[in-house]
Each structure stands twice: as structure tokens, then as C-alpha cells.
UniProtKB/Swiss-Prot annotation:
Main EC class the enzyme belongs to: transferase
Subunit structure: Homodimer.
UniProt GO molecular function: xanthine phosphoribosyltransferase activity
Name assigned to this protein: Xanthine phosphoribosyltransferase
Catalysed reactions, semicolon-separated: XMP + diphosphate = xanthine + 5-phospho-alpha-D-ribose 1-diphosphate
Database matches in Pfam families: Pribosyltran (PF00156)
Biological processes per GO annotation: purine ribonucleoside salvage; xanthine metabolic process; XMP salvage
Binding positions for 5-phospho-alpha-D-ribose 1-diphosphate per the UniProt entry: A113, N114, G115, Q116, A117
List of residues binding xanthine: L5, T12, K141
Database matches in SUPFAM superfamilies: PRTase-like
Family per record: Belongs to the purine/pyrimidine phosphoribosyltransferase family. Xpt subfamily.
One Gene Ontology cellular component annotation held by this UniProt entry: cytoplasm
Main localisation: cytoplasm
Length: 162
């Protein structure tokens, strides 16, 4: 279809680590003054840019896990995320022990389309009482409304390609 971008050679399947390291440095520089304490993403393709961003900021990186149905353990924070690409709703989760009210979080993800993944991560982070400082996106599908949704909700969005 017209809405598909092929990025499997460097981002979503094979990872170009030197490119990811540069991406991490760019996000780290942009958000250097924000006092970021954690980088949060969603599995799987957000992990590479997020880990290099966290490395450049020298903070931990947490990735939300996707599961169709999750056995609710104590202290697990969850949100529902609808994927327009796969047309399926997933439960995403992060163990609450990894986020605290003192945390200032930078969300990093590979794509921004409709903003549903970021919205789910924001819900989880806010359940923990932590603050979302900004959202960094490798590739924004600017013909979709994700940025609008997130900025209207008060979250700064930086995308490296749109």
C-alpha cells in the first residue's frame, strides 16, 4: 500500500548500529537540558534507537512488552494500544518498580503514525506518577494525525524524518 515505508534494512529487522548510535546522540543532545532519568519505548523496533539514546544520556532504558492477554501480576502497569497497521489491540506493560514519581521520561519510538503507541506509553508512565518530558520519533508519517494528538495533549514531539 501507499502507507508503507520500507525501513527493514536499518531499523525494523536489520539494525544499522552506527546510524542508531547517531540517532541516539541527536535525541540526547536535543533533550540534554530536560533532566531525563529514563528512556521508555515499546518492543520491538523502538528498542534500538531507545537503547542508544539511553546510552548517550547515561540513563536506563525500559521497553514496554506487548502481550495479547497478560496475567496481571502485582505492580504491573498496563495500557491498551491499537495498531492501525496490524489492526489489532495489544496490552502493553511495564513493571511498576522501574518507574517512580521522580522520573522524567523521554519516550523514543521508531514510528509515529496515529500516536497510539505513544499514547499507551504515556498512560503507563503517568500511572507510575512519572512525568513525560518529550517524545522522540525516528520516522514520522506526517500525513497521519499522531503529532497533532500528542502536541494537543501537551507533549513536545521531535521527529528526525517526516
Amino acid at each position: 500500500g501507499d502507507n508503507i515505508l520500507k525501513v527493514d534494512s536499518f531499523l525494523t529487522h536489520q539494525v544499522d548500529f552506527s546510524l542508531m548510535r547517531e540517532i541516539g546522540k541527536v535525541f540526547a543532545e536535543k533533550f540534554a537540558s530536560a533532566g531525563i532519568t529514563k528512556v521508555v519505548t515499546i518492543e520491538a523496533s523502538g528498542i534500538a534507537p531507545a537503547v542508544f539514546t539511553a546510552e548517550a544520556l547515561n540513563v536506563p532504558m525500559i521497553f514496554a512488552k506487548k502481550a495479547k492477554n497478560i496475567t496481571m501480576n502485582e505492580g504491573i502497569l498496563t495500557a491498551q494500544v491499537y495498531s492501525f497497521t496490524k489492526q489489532v489491540t495489544s496490552t502493553v506493560s511495564i513493571a511498576g518498580k522501574f518507574l517512580s514519581p521522580e522520573d522524567k521520561v523521554l519516550i523514543i519510538d521508531d514510528f509515529l503514525a496515529n500516536g497510539q503507541a505513544a499514547k499507551g506509553l504515556i498512560q503507563i508512565i503517568e500511572q507510575a506518577g512519572a512525568t513525560v518530558e518529550a517524545i522522540g520519533i525516528v520516522i514520522e508519517k506526517s500525513f497521519q494525525d499522531g503529532r497533532d494528538l500528542l502536541e494537543k495533549a501537551g507533549y513536545p514531539v521531535l521527529s528526525l524524518a517526516r
